[in-house]
From Swiss-Prot:
Its main location: cytoplasm. This is Acyl-[acyl-carrier-protein]--UDP-N-acetylglucosamine O-acyltransferase. One of its GO terms (biological process) is lipid A biosynthetic process. The keyword Repeat applies. Involved in the biosynthesis of lipid A, a phosphorylated glycolipid that anchors the lipopolysaccharide to the outer membrane of the cell.
Amino acid sequence: MAQVHPTAVVHPDARLHETVEVGPYSIIGPQVTIGAGSRVGPHVVIEGRTTLGERNRIFQFASVGADPQDLKYAGEDTELVLGDDNQIREFVSLHKGTAGGGGATRVGSGNLFMANCHVAHDCVVGNGCRIGNGSALAGHVTMEDHVIISGLAAVHQFTRLGKHAFISGGAMVTMDIPPYATAQGDRAELVGLNTVGLERSGFSKEQIERVKEAHRILFRSKLTLQEAMVRLRAELAGHSEVDHLIQFIQQSKRGLTR
């Protein structure tokens, strides 16, 4: 049986693995599922149709699975789904999805949500991401894997952040950030490549050089984006890291930060 502090309120219909720990004064609703090895600290609220995988840790005063801050929301049965090994720090808020956004907010595994950050309805967060203190994702934002957002940054709704991108502190992001890039400012602009992040993620020197050349063609060559894409396909297509960059740009709807 899960270890539940006597002051916590866990609905009898909630499904908690026997190794789950729930701290003082926390509240867990009837549609909540929490996987093995997860730890819920004091004064946490987990509600709605929320599913947490294994070994997640939720710190005090976090709000997980609350209704979306969307005036169109009318009580539809939507959900929040998290994978494994996530850390949700103090005063973080993660909201469930809306019917108009696919019905779910989805979070992968191995992510760190630092204190006071917010993930809005219908966001998709990949694996190995970091969101800094006080930063916020508006609704329908997509973060690919291994994206880092520093503190006090904000991301506009429907924006996409490419994998291994780095968003500097205080940035206001209103357009898609391409994979591997570093962006900063209000409104955010590209200032270089996240080389340190790529090295830490195990990219080879050859892969990093190809990414550098791809970014040079796209963002430093004075070509139009269409012209740069033609050149990029001709010179560097066929390598997975470049092919992903090409695909990301092709799928952009908000436009690309350059």
